[in-house]
Amino acid sequence: MKNDKTILIIDDDSKNIFALNAVLKARKYDCVSANSAAVGLEMLKQNKNIAIVLMDMMMPEMDGYEAIRVMKNDEELKEIPVIAITAQAMTGDREKCLEAGADGYVSKPVDISELVKLLDLLI
């Protein structure tokens, strides 16, 4: 492991989770995943070893924007950094993610070197 901390991947698309998990584990990161924001928030409350969240922004029921707001308003969770991962790459989308409380932003398809730089910076 790069460290003793865990990355939580929250994405409703199992293919995205699988791909990120494979790439990050190959780089010696420890990963866990959730297929919805609600499940991810519950995992964050139960697993104190999660160091950072990779959050898909477009999910049904609770989207990434709302999930980040919930995290940032929770005393236990507000210090955990979040990297927004989204297919939305138009002008203003990055700013919208950061305004919601994300600490970083990566557009899909994910540039792994960019993601690793952010992880190293934020963990």
Go through the PLM ranges and name each one:
Residues 18-26:
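Charged docking surfaces used in two-component/phosphorelay signaling
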